[in-house]
Swiss-Prot record:
Domain of life of the organism encoding this protein: Bacteria
PANTHER family recorded: INORGANIC CARBON TRANSPORTER SUBUNIT DABA-RELATED, UPF0753 PROTEIN AQ_863
Pfam families with a match to the protein in the record: DabA (PF10070)
Cofactor: Zn(2+)
Protein name per Swiss-Prot or TrEMBL: Probable inorganic carbon transporter subunit DabA
Organism whose genome encodes this protein: Marinobacter nauticus (strain ATCC 700491 / DSM 11845 / VT8)
Gene: dabA
UniProt xrefs under InterPro entries: DabA
Length: 801
């Protein structure tokens, strides 16, 4: 083999580090039942977005931009207008020449990678390279290894990591070849070091090669990265696991070395001369620069209107306190909440709505009665701290209920074992088939009514040692929530905490419609935990000592907003005192009216125009339980902006359900502590959501989940494959962003507006590496409000927009 690379330090130490460096470029994914939106380019955030796009184009033939025809259509249709193109060219430091830019749109867009691995190289006499065969072998090995639920015939043995499992299964065929046998070491670190010495890649090139190879099974690479990510956060589901992505990379490297070994000397020389130095990126071509100008003009077409609206909004001065509202309702920052908040304020002027991250600052796992696993209900960026365990009020009652549920589950498990057993699979159908007939008919006729998730009372404990929370800890949680949404005074008689969720049937992607801040779960549980804390007398006494006085006349209630039907379910209605019944009854009436207005507003996008209010609600209810419904709602499609500031900035605006809204009062945060939290957590989560939708539209073949109609679930809840494919699909199904004729999401980077002094925002950028990377490398656009002006952060300075 030509030109093996010599590494200066011990390979056993350096190579695994390089392998892990490559794995850091892969974004993680979560299981279907805990699915959350992820920025597919998160691992590349430290590079400028334009350069990363060029690198990905070189590695995969998959840059970030839409094809030229997309921008041409936007120009011809008037969505992009000349002022937008002029501004985009000016930002790029180029002279506006619309005719030249139009001509460059006609240039052919290359989707061919510049680098081709030895596995992807077609040798003389071959019809195709060995890549596809290897891809299928590794993909099926991953499916067998990670399939812990559906594959009930798997023979249990000694615990193996992924590399060892592959070695004992698929690796045996390679082991028969003497030239490769020396590479097959018993552990992945040693194997990676051995293989890397045999490859002609430098220490700079090796991580790029690994990234390229992992991209051929991006779904499984992302899954392995997710397992590593969750294990690092202490997830009990992933305990005892580590470096799965690195193990997968090592398997790929072994196959790459094998492909090189099989080449003739002439073939190796030809391949190396052509591809090994293909990692040196050429400067951006004129066509590429033009395409970025067109994309920026496409963004400016919406952002300019958005910023104009912010500047001209009818807002009161922060120096003028809002009159005390009759009700305060805190919603998740999710873009779908913008619609219900706007409609609720329209029908109920006495209400004040607020926006806050939908897990309500409760970093919890939820433990239900019976033999169930804990459910994480917090953002994927965080590790759970507390467990919320349901209780009937006494340990004896809890144990009795657990025993009953355990018995039921044992019966169900017996049926499942018979159903999946290799001996009884067919006889079970013959003997019990008729017993399932009524359920089949009932479900086919949509007779099951979808209901909001039941939320039972519970107690908070520490995840690690199981001890109850101390009073100061409970006060900390409550204070953190109230300060996060700048609600520290002027409390209304009713404080409603509204989580949100979606209720669908036969939908593996259901978690993608639920609350991302709650780990792909519905938000009612978190709302209930927060409301219980805020109603606790000892917690209120502790808050008062810290300067937050909640009057005795204020009650906190929890609720959940179904984003498909726009109905809001309030929990604990029977606990509302007589003194609050008038306000409560008014609230219930106004919530129903606001939901009705929301349904009318959404009818056009759902193709349900012309229906009466009753028929519209009935149709949306049907969607929650229809087996065949592929578009129960549009989720967060078309998200484009975020506002971190007082509601007065946006209360007079119709933002079309396109903006994340988080309340923030800069006058209550002189230290900038709250702003740091909001820009480093909710803003990053919004970026993850925004760029997942972006990727699912820009490159649905790579960063999307394909056609829902062809999905097959892998491993019970690992993910989905499309048709007979071998790779997990990441991102969003086509039906979530495309209506059959038009894209329902416009691929734009998030435009964030923050109402805070420049020095406070800049301090957050300096102090947080992730925020700095996203802002300075243009993965999002950051603006601030100053009087009646908006200014954009641009290379360390603020530019008037």
């Amino acid at each position: 083999m030509n030109a093996p690379v010599t590494y200066s330090a011990s390979c056993e130490q350096v190579i695994p580090e390089l392998v892990n460096e490559a794995c850091e470029r892969i974004a993680p994914i979560w299981p279907l039942d805990r699915w959350i939106a992820v920025n597919p380019w998160w691992g590349s955030r430290t590079g400028p977005v334009e350069k990363v796009s060029r690198e990905l184009d070189n590695l995969f033939g998959a840059g970030l931009l839409m094809p030229p025809a997309f921008y041409r259509e936007a120009w011809d249709g008037g969505r992009i207008q000349r002022p937008h193109l002029e501004e985009a060219a000016r930002e790029a430091g180029l002279k506006d020449d619309s005719q030249a830019l139009l001509a460059q749109l006609s240039g052919a867009a290359s989707n061919q990678p510049g680098f081709v691995s030895a596995l992807g190289y077609t040798r003389r006499g071959q019809q195709e390279p060995p890549l596809e065969e290897v891809r299928e072998e590794i993909g099926r090995a991953c499916a067998r290894y990670f399939d812990l639920r559906q594959n009930r015939w798997r023979v249990s043995g000694t615990k193996q990591d992924l590399y060892q499992f592959w070695l004992s299964q698929s690796g045996r065929s390679l082991a028969r070849k003497a030239s490769v046998e020396m590479l097959l070491k018993p552990d992945w670190q040693e194997a990676a070091a051995t293989v890397a010495r045999e490859l002609p890649y430098s220490s700079r090139q090796l991580p790029l090669v690994i990234h390229h190879l992992l991209g051929h099974l991006l779904g499984w690479a992302s899954w392995c990265r997710g397992v590593d990510w969750r294990a690092a956060l202490g997830d009990p589901h992933e305990s005892g696991t580590e470096h799965f992505c690195a193990q997968l990379a090592t398997i790929w490297l072994i196959h790459e070395a094998h492909a090189l070994i099989n080449m003739t000397e002439a073939e190796r020389e030809s391949w190396q001369n052509r591809y090994v130095n293909a990692f040196d990126l050429a400067p951006a071509s004129a066509n590429e620069q033009a395409l970025w100008i067109w994309h920026r003009a496409y963004e400016l077409a919406w952002q300019s209107r958005f910023l104009d609206d912010i500047r001209s909004s009818e807002r009161s001065s922060l120096a003028e306190p809002d009159p005390v509202a009759e009700v305060q309702a805190a919603f998740c920052i999710d873009v779908r909440s913008e619609v219900i908040r706007r409609q609720l304020e329209k029908v109920y002027p006495e209400i004040r709505t607020l926006g806050v991250a939908g897990f309500f600052g409760m970093p919890i796992v939820h433990h239900r009665h019976g033999p169930t696993d804990d459910e994480a209900r917090l953002p994927g960026l965080l590790a759970p701290v507390y467990r919320y365990s349901e209780t009937l009020g006494s340990p004896s009652e809890d144990r009795e209920l657990d025993r009953k549920l355990d018995s039921r589950e044992q019966v169900r498990e017996s049926v499942r074992r018979a159903k999946y057993s290799s001996l009884s699979t067919f006889t079970l159908v013959e003997t019990t088939g008729l017993a399932w007939a009524w359920k089949l008919v009932r479900d086919s006729l949509n007779r099951n009514s979808a209901k909001a998730e039941a939320v039972e009372p519970g107690r908070l404990h520490h995840c690690v040692d199981g001890y109850p929370l101390s009073d100061p800890e409970r006060v900390n949680l409550a204070e953190g929530l109230l300060r996060a949404m700048s609600l520290t005074k002027g409390f209304a008689s009713v404080l409603l905490l509204v989580g949100h969720g979606a209720h669908t049937d036969n939908n593996p992607n259901e978690a993608g419609l639920a609350c991302g801040a709650c780990g792909g779960k519905n938000g009612g549980v978190n709302a209930r935990v927060a409301a219980e804390l805020l109603n606790d007398r000892q917690v209120r006494a502790g808050l008062a000592e810290r300067g937050i006085v909640m009057p005795e006349s204020t009650i906190a209630l929890a609720a959940e907003h179904c984003t498909i039907t726009d109905r809001i379910t309030i929990y604990g209605r029977d606990q509302v005192p007589d003194s609050h019944q008038r306000v409560f009854n008014t609230l219930v009436e106004k919530l129903e009216a606001a939901g009705q207005a929301c349904r009318r507003e959404r009818a056009t996008s759902l193709g349900l125009n012309g229906k009466t209010d009753d028929d519209l609600l009935a149709e949306l209810k049907r969607r929650t339980r229809n087996w065949a419904e592929v578009r129960p709602e549009w989720g967060l499609a078309n998200n484009a902006g975020m506002v971190i500031g007082p509601r007065s900035l946006t209360r007079s605006l119709d933002l079309g359900g396109r903006c994340f809204l988080h309340d923030y009062d800069p006058s209550q945060d002189p230290s900038g502590e709250v702003l740091t939290l909001l820009m480093s957590a909710p803003m990053v989560v919004a970026n993850w959501i925004n760029l997942q939708y972006f990727g699912s539209v820009a490159r649905p073949d790579i960063f999307g989940a394909g056609n829902k109609l062809l999905h097959s679930v892998v491993g019970g809840n690992l993910g989905v494959v499309e048709g007979n494919g071998v790779d997990l699909k990441i991102g969003l199904p086509l039906q979530s962003v495309f209506d059959g004729e038009h894209w329902r999401h416009e691929p734009m980077r998030l435009a964030v507006v923050v109402d805070a002094p420049a020095e406070r925002i800049e301090a957050v950028i300096r102090g947080n590496a992730d925020v700095r990377a996203l802002v300075e490398n243009r993965w999002l656009w950051l603006h601030r409000v100053e009087g009646d002006q908006t200014l954009r952060y641009d290379d360390g300075r603020w530019v008037t927009t």
